[in-house]
Amino acid sequence: MQSEATRVASLPCIAVTAGDPAGVGPEVVRAALSSPDLARGFRFELVGEQEVSFKSGVPTARGSGWAFAALEAAVAGALSGKYAAVVTGPVNKERMKEVGFGFPGQTEFFASRCGVKDYVMCLTGGPLCVGLVTAHIALSEVPSLLTVREIEKTGLLLAAFLERRLGRLPRVAVAGLNPHAGRAACLVQRRPLSLVPPSSD
């Protein structure tokens, strides 16, 4: 008969990084890992040096170096097969740049380390999964980057991901740049922004 320790050891392991040690990440991670609602079909491993002390609310380059090292360890473990997935806490992007983190965000970091060129940041809650056409850029830059090609690429990547996850083709909708402005965009600009639906190309 299989022992409980053996059964637990055989479960897929998910790596968890706390993010910036001076931020909200460590507190949220501790609460999540002790929650009775935590998925029981997995093991969770907190990645990163544990015997460290940082002042809450005061992000530093040292703390970001700690967070960066945890990310590197987590992605290395995932690529080696040690971890089935990685969950990350939030980092301080300004301080991360000071320690050589040359990415706009963690999404781009993982894409680079995994050698992935085409990827989409997804936000999932309940039955809804949202794929972002743009991310980690200034809002003023969004209109110039919202092209038919980028919308189509994001939609196809999102659909492929959801098909693997759900086992069926999903329904994909495209939200406007400013959905609150109405169909004619009359609230915010004199000239409507035209986006040709990818399906018509």
Regions found by a protein language model. Name each.
Residues 1-107, 145-201:
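Contiguous, glycine/small-aliphatic-enriched amphipathic segments in soluble metabolic enzymes
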Residues 46, 119-121, 130:
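Conserved beta-strand scaffold positions in the cores of enzyme catalytic domains, especially
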Residues 107-117:
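A glycine-rich helix N-cap at a beta->alpha junction
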Residues 123-157:
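Ligand-binding beta-strand-loop-alpha-helix segment within the catalytic cores
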